[in-house]
């Protein structure tokens, strides 16, 4: 028969009531166990806390200064505030607090939900508050964007593969005879953005070196179909076959001439003629004559 042990029962209750509290971002040392649910900002007061004299009692009583954690990990996130003591935290209902001073001290202060924020139609006050906050943030971000000088629009591109190869716009004749813009492959918005910022494009090679993409001065490849010019390709991206630039950047460093192909063909014919002459010389030797005698 099992006997009742009050000590084991107390230990079981203590295990149930334990809380795991995290006071930072770094390492496992910021997780500790607590029997009570502590404040997320104020750490429990310990014996190693600094003491400060109470000015009201002429320094006769000593009060311990609470410690605070600002949540970045390590011992550097714990600091002492000698002005905020335990007695200072005990607020009575009759105390007059200037909340405007509190709001000004906090950068990301969000006002509580009050009666004037709730619409008469009975809309959700939380949604209403969020909409006001989002509207304020969007106004601030818009003001910051327009006020900053030389603010260039960013170019969002892919990370490699065939999807980051675009074609430049060209003029084609429509059925009515008017010229229209035609884009083959890619998105129209992306194409317009890239064409407007061609000077700011960068080519990222496989070894991670970034080279400025300069407009190519080489001749465009001829198209077999008359009246149609091949669109100018250029690729942007970080990996895969998409970081091979043609013809905008890769042809800047490679001087390709169409006459080189003709010279290569001529050299190939010359080499073939030399090989045939060598074979004839071998056949006209002494051993070749002996072979013909026995054959």
UniProtKB/Swiss-Prot annotation:
| Positions bearing Phosphoserine | 36, 39, 47, 123, 138, 141, 147, 246
- The portions of this protein that span the membrane are none
* Swiss-Prot/TrEMBL keywords: Acetylation, Cytoplasm, Phosphoprotein
Question: Where does this protein have compositionally biased stretches of type Low complexity?
Answer: 285-295
Entry superkingdom:
Eukaryota
Compositionally biased region (Basic and acidic residues): 265-274
The annotated regions of Polar residues compositional bias extend over 134-153, 246-256
Q: Where is this region: Disordered?
A: 134-156, 217-295
Any one cellular component term from GO for this entry?
cytoplasm
Q: Which residues are reported to carry the modification N-acetylalanine?
A: 2
Basic residues bias spans:
217-227, 275-284
Keyword hit for tRNA processing = no
Q: What post-translational changes are documented for it?
A: Hyperphosphorylated after treatment with rapamycin in a TAP42-dependent manner.
Note one Pfam family from the annotation. Answer: DUF3602
- Tell where it localizes: Cytoplasm
What's its job? Involved in resistance to cisplatin.
Q: What other comment is given for this protein?
A: Present with 1140 molecules/cell in log phase SD medium.
Listed PANTHER family: PROTEIN PAR32 (PTHR34693:SF1)
Name of this protein: Protein PAR32
Q: Which gene encodes it?
A: PAR32
């Amino acid at each position: 028969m099992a006997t009742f042990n009050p000590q084991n029962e107390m230990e079981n209750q203590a295990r149930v009531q334990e809380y795991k509290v995290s006071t930072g971002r770094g390492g496992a040392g910021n997780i500790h166990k607590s029997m009570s649910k502590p404040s997320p900002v104020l750490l429990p007061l310990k014996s190693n806390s600094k003491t400060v004299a109470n000015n009201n009692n002429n320094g006769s009583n000593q009060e311990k200064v609470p410690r605070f954690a600002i949540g970045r990990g390590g011992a550097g996130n714990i600091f002492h505030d000698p002005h905020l003591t335990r007695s200072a935290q005990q607020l009575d209902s009759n105390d007059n607090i200037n909340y405007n001073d509190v709001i000004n001290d906090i950068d990301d202060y969000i006002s509580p939900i009050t009666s004037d924020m709730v619409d008469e139609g009975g809309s959700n006050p939380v949604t209403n508050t969020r909409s006001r906050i989002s509207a304020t943030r969007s106004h601030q971000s818009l003001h910051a964007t327009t006020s900053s000088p030389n603010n260039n629009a960013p170019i969002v591109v892919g990370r490699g593969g065939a999807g980051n190869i675009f074609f430049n716009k060209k003029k084609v004749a429509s059925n009515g005879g008017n010229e229209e813009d035609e884009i083959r492959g890619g998105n129209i918005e992306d194409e317009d953005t890239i064409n407007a910022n061609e000077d700011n494009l960068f080519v990222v090679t496989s070894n991670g070196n970034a080279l400025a993409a300069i407009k190519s001065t080489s001749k465009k490849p001829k198209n077999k179909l008359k009246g149609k010019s091949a669109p100018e390709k250029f690729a942007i991206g970080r990996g895969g076959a998409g970081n091979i630039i043609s013809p905008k950047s890769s042809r800047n460093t490679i001087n390709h001439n169409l006459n080189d192909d003709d010279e290569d063909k001529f050299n190939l014919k010359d080499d073939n003629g030399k090989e045939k002459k060598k074979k004839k010389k071998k056949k006209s030797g002494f051993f070749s004559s002996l072979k013909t005698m026995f054959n």
